[in-house]
Structures are given as structure tokens and as C-alpha cells.
Amino acid sequence: MPPTDSIHLIIHSPERTILEKMVCKVSFPGTKGRFMVLKDHAPLISSLEEGRIVFVSGGVEENIDIKTGFVEIAYNKVTVCVEL
């Protein structure tokens, strides 16, 4: 059975909202190393370094390259603020 898109991902930049969609997983370039978020991940706040945010929605892998940022994870909602 394929995973369901049950994580609400929102990516903001200082200029605009870049993306808002439901995903089944997302990985980030954390300053302490790359990490992945799946459904029901523990609450977390982390800084991000230059790299690629990779997420899967509807079985399709997509990505966004960033310079720096922060991510907050809580209750299947992932909010990201980045500079591109």
C-alpha cells in the first residue's frame, strides 16, 4: 500500500509563499545533517543550510534548492521559511 499524502507542507520566502501542498514525506538539509520527516514526526525546530528540500506528493518526487532557512514541525504540519 503506497504512503498517503498526510503532511501539510508550507514553504515561505521573504517575498512570497513558494509552495503549499500535502506530501507523504519531505527531507531537509539541516545544519547538523540531512533529515527526513514522515507522518507523525515528533515536534521539532531546526535551522537549514544550503541544499535541496526534497518532497514526495502523489507519488512524484519534487525539490526546491535553498540557501538557508528554518523549519518547524508539529502535528503533521511542516512550516519552512527559506532564502532562495
Please identify what each model-predicted range represents.
Residues 2-3:
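Sequence/structural signature of small/polar-enriched beta-strand/turn repeats
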Residues 6-84:
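Compact, glycine-rich, soluble single-domain proteins
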